[in-house]
Amino acid sequence: MSVMFDKIPTQKYNYGMILTYSDIVKKETSVRKARKAIFDKKYLKIGHGLYCQDIIDYDSLEVIFSRYKNIIVTLNTAFEIYDMVDRNSSKYTIATVEWSRVITSINVDQIFTSKKYFNIGKTKMLYQGFYIYIYDKERLLIELIRNKHRFPYDYYKEVVNSYRKLFINHELDINKLRKYLKHFTYGNSILSRIMEVIV
């Protein structure tokens, strides 16, 4: 049985079980045994060079991070992971550096980002048993304002309300936000718009 990458389901399963061919060789102790194990369907192919031991042993976000290295979770998917919205998107929203190769998976919404801004607010998170890179809440607030046109009005308001709660509870680092915005064109204007909506 082969599960191709562009048809990976979006449901959550057990985590941290993605294996490369090299992992299988180490686990089976030889190339011959590894090939036999794959032939005997002990390991299921879920993408180019990626395997799992059981169809329920992987999550599609884990596969994405196994296959593409220089990516960051952003916008809709990040808002969901941070519990800032009460809904689930059908696609994962992933930021890559501009001019990166196109991610061809049907369940990825790829956002091309200027190299100048790409790593601002990037943080490593243990998520469902595997590590991902995701923008912190301060960087996401900047992206929310910069990309307001991407969102339906009710979705945008839901995220804004979550940020208002963070601000009221002193869980939003305004100094960090100001520091980030020094790197952005029209940073002062973005800050003014942010303060208008969250205060």
Walk through the language-model features, giving the residues of each.
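Short amphipathic alpha-helical interaction segments
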Residues: K26-F39
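Residue-level preference for nonpolar/small residues embedded in alpha-helices
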Residues: M4, G16, T29-S30, I71
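Nucleic-acid-binding surface
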Residues: L19-D23, L50-V199
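Charged, low-complexity surface patches
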Residues: Y13, K26-K27, R67-Y68
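Short amphipathic alpha-helical interface segments
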Residues: S2-L19
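Active-site-proximal helix-loop elements at catalytic-domain edges
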Residues: F39-D40, S89
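A short, conserved structural fragment
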Residues: D40-G47
